[in-house]
């Protein structure tokens, strides 16, 4: 005898076995392979391969894959705009080499432009892919012409769900990577980045990452050799994580500069497991003082932790008089709001440039300085470890010596 509950179950099983599933009935549910395009390279620096790449994007950019094969070189003599890529996968196993023309690139914003794109992977699966900014001519020209405007190598504005990974980026004329325009969910990982000059003119202003107005940006497993900030948290950066990064020759992991011409906010930043080699500072915060059209700078919920300091001039620095003279700041003190700033787990040895000083914390006299330091064991080569402080809280966590500047 079938009880009502068993009868209902039997009826359900009979119905499910009698009728085929929707997956079986619907051919539309079968996954289709991604379209794959390989742009045709012109094979000569005199031939601009950007039109061929744009043609490939038109054919395969909507959900497809664009492949630059290993052993190939594509010469890019104009801006490469990735417009038309949506949920696309760009696999660079060869070399994308931009021209060194200072005439063409002067005044351009970007060399490789990602504007309002949702869903894009720009990557090398093998680690052989190179994006070469060919910046030597720009380094030399900028040395004699400080008004020369140079482009950023990779410029991301707006959009979401963007990944840049596995690549080598080399010799940008200016900044390596810039993110702004309220971009969301960007990941940079497994990158090797180097800006080096073969003349006496250094690769100026080659920030590794300028992270502006954006949320949920992650930078991980990256090495940077350059001549400016390794990572700079610019106005509007929010929820940014930087981890397992090695920076050589840089100006540090930096918040700012902020407040130059209006109010600026940076918040919810975590930088941890960082190795800093021969940098002007390992980490720091740069804000403009009050007056002269400067705006209020607000820095909230920022943690710098587990830094290995190797030959950096300062292990940590706070500058509240950035961009102005000491005499100016005596009349127009810094007014930045620093709230929830945590510095912990710093170890290693400074360069000795400021021996015995290892850190310089100059908080603004008219601002807020909610900063804490712990497990801070960095020493100068002499074995001493002086921390200069002005306007810091009594609960800072380290012994202070007056005389901070900057």
From Swiss-Prot:
GO terms for cellular component: extracellular region. It is an enzyme of class 3 (hydrolase). Keywords: Carbohydrate metabolism, Cell wall biogenesis/degradation, Glycoprotein, Glycosidase, Hydrolase, Polysaccharide degradation, Repeat, Secreted, Signal. PbH1 repeats lie at residues 183-213, 214-235, 237-257, 299-320. The keyword Lyase does not apply. This is Probable endo-xylogalacturonan hydrolase A. Pectinolytic enzyme involved in the degradation of xylogalacturonan (xga), a galacturonan backbone heavily substituted with xylose, and which is one important component of the hairy regions of pectin. Activity requires a galacturonic acid backbone substituted with xylose. Belongs to the glycosyl hydrolase 28 family. SUPFAM superfamilies: Pectin lyase-like. The active site is at residues 228, 251. InterPro entries: Glyco_hydro_28, PbH1, Pectin_lyas_fold, Pectin_lyase_fold/virulence. Residues 1-18 form the signal peptide. One of its GO terms (biological process) is cell wall organization. GO terms for molecular function: polygalacturonase activity. Its EC number is 3.2.1.-. It is found in: Secreted. Glycans are attached at residue 301.
